[in-house]
Design a protein with these regions (language model features):
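Active-site neighborhoods and metal-handling regions in enzymes and metal-associated proteins
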Residues: 1-376
Length: 376
């Protein structure tokens, strides 16, 4: 990614938490390490603990030993700290101008500036190529999606088999709760070596807040929104899916909302393709809801209607560019995005349906295979 206006790229982070660093190295580590690309050649600084693993796993040109650099610095009577190791390498390679991500650690940035280096930052996407998924990356995302669907299927079977008693769902004589369904999903995902955080199983009025994770007993004849977005511990890639179900009978307004959200999703499927403006897709869906009488805005002191974006990119992060929203942004082939319109009203509940798709030159390829059924 080098350009004439800088000599080196520098990232200092833990690749387990920094998607850009993992993308650049394909090396997963829990502790921070130094990555630098100097005029096209990629180096890592690694401790004795991780150096052999890095040499065998990391997709880089050279792995440098921090302990060896520390010895070299000590002979120069320079403190053997990371900043001075970077400085020593950059002096040898005649580096003056450095590109860093916008979350670069301040302490290192300040130290490099004091040593006379010029720093430039870059907004996301730091690596432009992350926007476009290779077939290998798509296969990894799809693998995580299949695991997600298997976990959700197990949860749906439990909801389906539950009994209705006094307006609540029961299994084996005990109330069926949001927490119980989340546990079923998360444990099943662990069997597939997938890690789920903040899984959503919300019910009734809780559904009106799209990011409410849900709690307490699940109710009969009310909307239940399940939103599951795990990361594969093996590959690092996320999947994302949402469905809405009702155990029992949905009220007429909720049925209409479900129908409209499905129609909105179909509008998204038809419009998404290489070169389309994401805001056109989002606005067309919003207009469809408005036309059918489902308004968006403050109602009784709460945001209700369709008040979030239609979709977002998915990859090494659960939310990454591009966005399909009211903000203009060109969607391009080989991007993986969600299509997840929703409608939310306090007097009826919430509905969201989310599929994961690959954008192609002429349309989309849907990675989601799970059936959409409202009433169980």
């Amino acid at each position: 990614m080098n350009q004439p206006n800088y000599d080196a790229v520098l990232i200092i982070a833990a690749s387990e938490k920094d998607a850009n660093l993992y993308y650049a190295t394909r090396f997963l580590a829990p502790d921070p390490f130094i990555y630098t690309e100097i005029r096209g050649k990629i180096y890592l600084f690694m401790s004795d603990l991780e150096i052999d693993r890095a040499k065998s796993e990391a997709k880089v040109d050279e792995v440098l030993s921090t302990s060896e650099f520390a010895k070299r610095l000590q002979t120069k009577k320079v403190e053997p700290v990371s900043l001075n190791m970077i400085d020593l390498l950059y002096q040898e390679e005649k580096v003056k101008e450095i590109l860093v991500p916008n979350n670069f650690p301040f302490i290192y940035g300040e130290g490099l500036l004091k040593k006379g280096y010029r720093l430039m930052t870059k907004e996301e996407p730091f690596f432009e190529s992350r926007l476009f998924k290779t077939e290998e990356e798509i296969a990894k995302i799809e693998e995580t999606q299949r695991c997600t669907e298997a976990a959700v299927e197990e949860a749906i079977h439990v909801i389906e088999r539950s009994r209705i008693e006094n307006g609540k769902l029961y299994v084996n004589g005990k109330p069926l709760t949001s927490e119980a369904i989340k546990k079923i999903i998360n444990v099943k995902l662990m069997e597939f070596d997938c890690i789920a955080e903040h899984t959503i199983v919300s019910c009734a009025k809780d559904c009106v807040d799209p990011h409410n994770q849900g709690s307490g007993p699940l109710l009969a004849n009310e909307s239940i929104v399940l939103d599951v977005f795990p990361r594969s511990a093996k590959t690092g890639y996320f999947a994302d899916m949402t469905l809405t179900v009702v155990k029992g009978k949905a009220n007429p307004k909720l049925k209409k909302m479900y129908q409209l959200v499905k129609e909105g999703q179909e509008i998204g499927f038809k419009l998404l393709k290489d070169g389309v403006d994401g805001s056109v897709v989002h606005n067309r869906i919003a207009e469809h809801f408005e036309k059918e009488g489902f308004k968006t805005g403050q109602i009784d002191g709460r945001m209700q209607g369709f008040f979030h974006g239609t979709g977002h990119g998915v990859g090494l992060e659960i939310h990454e560019p591009p966005r399909v929203s009211s903000v203009k942004q060109t969607i391009q082939a080989s991007q993986v995005v969600t299509v997840e319109p929703g409608l939310y009203y306090l007097d009826a509940g919430g509905v969201r349906i989310e599929d994961l798709v690959v954008v192609t030159k002429t349309g989309i390829r849907n990675l989601t295979k799970f059936p959409k059924v409202l009433e169980l």
